[in-house]
Structure formats: structure tokens, C-alpha cells
């Protein structure tokens, strides 16, 4: 179904709004993916905080023109889907990587993160980024490690002193 001018403006406005909030963008070719496979991927995308949209390239170019993802315009050729990571930078990468393992018809074409265009191979790098929760857990571990080591050292010193006190305590003899 063809979109009229007002519908196209709404699509551009919606996509531009999503792009301003997104951490990263992956553009992928989806030719050969069935409707049921695409529906499953959209469901998976919703669950993982990824905005997934199939849109005409000309509309996408207009929507991304004033955002940090304008660098991706040169890669907008052929039938493409746009995966925006809304919750953490690696979410779209994990989605595309996982889905392309099962369905070889889905091929990533470009990655954009922080206003920089990366080749399609960087999807693996993006997918390997930890989630926000994992990153916070790693940070908490790094921050707690010095305190843990200090507590162990204090305990070792206290244990060592208690052993020395027990050994060197004078015996009282009552005769």
C-alpha cells in the first residue's frame, strides 16, 4: 500500500524521534526472509528493547539526515531494515547476530554508533558489548575488590595476632 504525503511525514518524524534516542543503529538486508520469520524477529526485538522498522530508503535518509546516523546514508541501497538499540548499545547487534545465525538471508550491511559508520563485520563487536546490568555488575565487582582485599588483610593480621597471643600466653602454676 502506497503512503500519502502525510503518512510519509509521520514515518519520517517517528523514525527521526527514535534515532535521537537510540544508542546504535544496524542496517541489514532482509530479502528472502519470510513474513513469519520477520514477525518472530519483531517480537524478539520488542522484548530486547530494539526498535525494528522496514522503511523506504528515501524516507530513512530524510529521517536520519539531522541525526548522528546521517553517516549511514551512503549504505541505503536495496531492501533494508533498521534496528535501533534503545536500551543499551549492543541490543540490536545481539538481535541481528542471533537471528542471522538461524536465517542466512539476513545480512547486516552497516553499523553506526556515536556518529561513526562501521562496516557490517562490526555487528559481532557490538553484540559482544555487555548489557547495562552486566556492565554495572562488573563495575560493582571492580569497586568492591579493594575493600574485599583490605578486609582479608585485616582478618589475616587479626588471626595471626590471636595465634601469637595464644602461644605466648604465660602459664600460671599453682603449687
Curated annotation (Swiss-Prot):
Pfam families: Ribosomal_L10 (PF00466). Belongs to the universal ribosomal protein uL10 family. Part of the ribosomal stalk of the 50S ribosomal subunit. The N-terminus interacts with L11 and the large rRNA to form the base of the stalk. The C-terminus forms an elongated spine to which L12 dimers bind in a sequential fashion forming a multimeric L10(L12)X complex. The keyword rRNA-binding applies. InterPro entries: Ribosomal_uL10, Ribosomal_uL10-like_sf, Ribosomal_uL10_bac, Ribosomal_uL10_bac_type, Ribosomal_uL10_CS_bac. It comes from the Bacteria. Gene3D superfamilies: 3.30.70.1730. This is Large ribosomal subunit protein uL10. Forms part of the ribosomal stalk, playing a central role in the interaction of the ribosome with GTP-bound translation factors. The gene is rplJ. One of its GO terms (cellular component) is large ribosomal subunit. Signal peptide: none annotated. GO terms for biological process: translation. SUPFAM superfamilies: Ribosomal protein L10-like. One of its GO terms (molecular function) is structural constituent of ribosome. It comes from Xylella fastidiosa (strain M12).
